[in-house]
A protein has these predicted regions:
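Helical mechanochemical/support elements of P-loop NTPase systems and associated helical scaffolds
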Residues: 12, 25, 54-58, 71, ...
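Conserved catalytic network of the ASCE P-loop NTPase/AAA+ motor domain
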Residues: 20-23, 30-35, 66-72, 95-99, ...
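Active-site glycine-centered loops adjacent to acidic/histidine catalytic or metal-binding residues
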Residues: 41, 108, 143
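Flexible beta-alpha connector loops of hexameric P-loop NTPases
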Residues: 45-55, 111-114
Length: 163
């Protein structure tokens, strides 16, 4: 949600919680003046401290969502730079690959690491993504707090949406 706020240059567009995984439903954000173009905030159930039963429900829901939405143009996968490529992250990338959608990984909270550590993580993630997903997935460092990478992300999304 904080990435959406940074992307759209609005501090309170998407509700942000200190606890990861609080988004528990699909939240659609229109992109005026572009009719029928939306950003969608998905449940971060891989990070939420919720019962296994609820996680299973979200997973089934997202399976259906990704399987039935022909209008999807790309998927931004939000990963904590300190803990990248968790099972949930791989699952989200799998959704994109099965649908033939481009995916773009943002390694968030990059301001929490030094430049060297952030760069090392970026390189390691880039290598693993190239090994497992070829050229279908791009990756960058990102910080909603310091605005690092916001312009790059905006450019990727604009390209997908033809803006």
């Amino acid at each position: 949600s904080s990435a959406l706020n940074a992307l759209c240059q609005q501090n309170a567009l998407a509700r942000v919680s200190k606890t990861p995984g609080r988004t528990q439903q699909l939240v659609f954000f229109g992109l005026p003046p572009h009719e029928n173009k939306y950003l969608v905030d998905l449940p971060g159930y891989g990070y939420a401290k919720v019962p296994q039963e609820l996680q299973a429900h979200w997973q089934a829901f997202l399976d259906g969502y990704f399987g039935s939405r022909d209008a999807l143009r790309g998927l931004v996968v939000v990963m904590d730079v300190r803990h990248p490529l968790k099972d949930y992250d791989r699952q989200m990338l799998g959704y994109a690959m099965r649908r033939g959608l481009p995916a773009h990984v943002i390694l968030t909270k990059a301001d929490k690491l030094g430049r060297g550590a952030g760069g090392n993580t970026l390189q390691a993630v880039r290598m693993e993504l190239a090994r497992n997903y070829a050229d279908s997935v791009s990756v960058q460092l990102f910080s909603g707090e310091s605005k690092l990478g916001v312009d790059e992300l905006r450019s990727v999304v604009a390209g997908w949406l033809g803006l």
